[in-house]
A protein has these predicted regions:
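Extended two-metal-dependent nuclease catalytic cores across DNA- and RNA-processing enzymes
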Residues: 22, 73-254, 278
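Conserved beta-strand edge residues that scaffold enzyme active sites
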Residues: 57-58, 105, 286
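Domain-level signal for Mg2+-assisted phosphodiester chemistry and nucleotide/NA-binding surfaces
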Residues: 1-95, 151, 258
Length: 296
């Protein structure tokens, strides 16, 4: 079986800025919710049997306590923020497993779920549906892959190396050096993508990079200056790597079959009608997901 893990936050942002405004009868902006719902149901109609959507129910996470400049909900359009809880409600009614993250981020949920699902021998592939470079650290061979659904590009481990110049395990170190503007941390001055990739392709992790740049023997611009910066900014480099490292110790499910889609709830049609969303056929009640009381 294949497991599809969807970045609901990314999808909501993408549809919000791609679609014209639509409001429901109560005046709520719902265009992005409609777009994401249609997209997820399209995946199911296309053959996805096991699917879960992770969202940032609250934009802030534990990382905001580590770095004051880390991303927050400031500046996000109120009409967009208001659709997070609505999206979660609609997807749950549609029968889709939703993980609304509070202390952790949606990316953490996807990372934890990918690792957990990949341990199941019945799982042939885990598909991370997001273009977010953070999730590249979770890619493993061709078993855990990353899918950019908008561009229809699937990246396996070889693809990560081709794209970033480093293996998945080095992605947090890479982001620590180059920074991530979307997440709000700057990286180290002077450390660009090419030099960072060249150094980490050889040494893998920050701790393994020699302090003496003459030992590097890689094609990097101004290696002496880079070495000095790394030494001077060492604490920030380690902190930024911690920000970039996704948490995989979050327990989200006990069995991957909990992610199987078994059809919408009885209240979905009424909710969908309010959104003028696509209706789906309901599966027999006997085949619906087992209750938590039956879990081992």
């Amino acid at each position: 079986m294949e497991i599809y893990l969807v970045d609901g936050t990314y999808e909501l942002f993408r549809h919000y800025y791609a679609l014209p405004s639509v409001r429901d009868r109560d005046g709520r902006e719902v265009a992005a919710v409609r777009g994401v719902l249609s997209s997820v149901l399209g995946m199911i109609k296309g053959g996805a049997t096991h699917i879960a959507v992770a969202t940032d129910h609250v934009i802030e996470s534990f990382r905001n306590k580590l770095w004051p400049g880390y991303k927050t909900g400031d500046g996000i359009e109120p009409d967009l923020l208001a659709q997070f809880s609505l999206l979660e409600e609609v997807l749950v009614a549609a029968g889709v497993v939703v993980w609304p993250m509070v202390e952790f981020e949606a990316d953490d949920a996807m990372a934890a779920a990918a690792v957990a699902a990949s341990k199941n021998t019945d799982v042939t592939r885990v598909i991370l549906c997001t273009p977010d470079k953070d999730l590249a650290q979770c890619v493993s061979g061709s078993r855990i892959v990353q899918l950019n659904r908008r561009k229809q590009i699937t990246i396996d481990e070889a693809g990560v190396i081709q794209k970033f110049g480093v293996a998945p395990e080095s992605i947090p170190d890479y982001l620590a050096l180059v920074g991530d503007a979307a997440d709000g941390y700057p990286g180290l001055p002077g450390w660009g993508a090419k030099s960072s990739a060249a150094v980490l392709a050889k040494f893998l992790h920050l701790e393994s990079i020699p302090k003496n740049w003459r030992e590097w023997r890689v094609n990097a611009t101004n290696p002496g200056s880079l070495a000095d910066t790394l030494c001077r900014e060492w604490e920030n480099a380690i902190l930024f790597r911690r920000l970039a490292t996704l948490r995989t110790d979050i327990r989200l499910f006990d069995d991957v079959d909990e992610l199987r889609w078994l059809g919408p709830s009885s209240g979905f049609d009424a909710l969908a009608a309010r959104l003028d969303a696509t209706r789906t056929e309901r599966t027999p009640a006997a085949t619906r997901r087992k209750s938590s009381a039956t879990k081992s």
